């Protein structure tokens, strides 16, 4: 029921937000608009005054931009701001002259009518620099079959630009330093291109930047020492970045999400990370982190998801009080991190915890008896460790979690004969847990009960996905409902 209650609350939030935010469209408040512009952005406009018109040079620029994307039909529109086609937003000035403030290209979803791009011949037109009032520019899956570099002239779009989204366009080469000239940028999204080279140091000029997504590229070098006080979202996952997590990152006190997963980041997690008291998601999975388990994590009292999977150089124990202050933690993924020692009893006192993955480590000792009374967990993975002793779970816990309770490949685990768990463990398992010897509390030489973990043919159960990427894990489904729409949700935040 807790799972359905969580999704119910998410859908309530989305039902409130969705009328206010169109996919990949920024509605800027009057307070941030240039003084020469009045009212709000409009997709087309009603002619209440026959003198209303689009600024002629901007109209010609839009024609050029549309032709560059294969949309030659736009030249037949007598006035681009009153053409009533999605993908363009305009705003009037005090002389009733309309200016283009937003352009969007690419099919975001089945119900989005933004102009598509001709994949064979589309390119980014330099006429964009003639749109002096442009606040938002979106290109989504427009240029994949005609790979090219990000044009340096985009850095001349001026101080009005607040949102630049160039997702999945197959851009090659380095990120141009000139983008750092867009000093009023709030959202920069270059997700899933083929960019290489280092992250430009000029990005430190983005004093008002709130969301930076460079994920899914081939960027190299170290993570710059960003000091961006307004930054809420930092997503650099799936690159080739090296070096440590920069300590200056903790100066970005507005961070809600940090995803540095699937890079080659080394060294310890900075102790100063406890300054990020608004952080909700921290994903450092599949890097080369080392050092002791950071005690400073307990200061992240807003944290809801912590993923450190696949950092095999940790080789450390988990301190008993490591998660003391994480009262909001819902998802904890520490799989395959070479963690040693026993399972901390304090994990059972995290009352918000729903998903716990500790599989593939070197954990020893018994599963703490305190897990017997844990009612809030919906997914627990302890498989592939060296745990011993009786399984402490109550019958209803085993039934409730079913295949999401994984204990296989712990040769020392056993089930007490009087525990009434024999039929609670499913028959489709692929591994077994033996009955306990009454005298030693260790597995008896004979007699087994099946344990639910994976199907008999070795495949994962129906509906499950192997956690080859932490962000796709079953457990992460709780937060994915929020963060899958987060790129749109953040646009609402920056407009408030």
From Swiss-Prot:
Cellular location(s): Cell membrane
UniProt xrefs under InterPro entries: At_inactive_RLKs, Leu-rich_rpt, Leu-rich_rpt_typical-subtyp, LRR_dom_sf
Induction: Up-regulated by SPCH-SCRM module.
LRR repeats: 158-182, 183-208, 210-228, 229-252, 254-276, 277-300, 302-325, 326-350, 351-373, 375-401
Residue stretches spanning the membrane: 474-494
Topology relative to the membrane: Single-pass type I membrane protein
Function: Promotes cell fate progression in stomatal development. In leaves, needed to correctly orient spacing divisions, to limit the number of asymmetric divisions in neighbor cells, and to promote the asymmetric (amplifying) divisions of meristemoids. In stems, promotes the conversion of meristemoids into guard mother cells (GMC). Positively regulates CAPRICE (CPC) expression in differentiating stomaless-forming cell files. Forms constitutive complexes with ERECTA and ERL1 involved in the recognition of the stomatal regulatory peptides EPF1, EPF2 and EPFL9/STOMAGEN.
Family recorded in the similarity comment: Belongs to the RLP family.
Protein's name in the database: Protein TOO MANY MOUTHS
Protein's gene: TMM
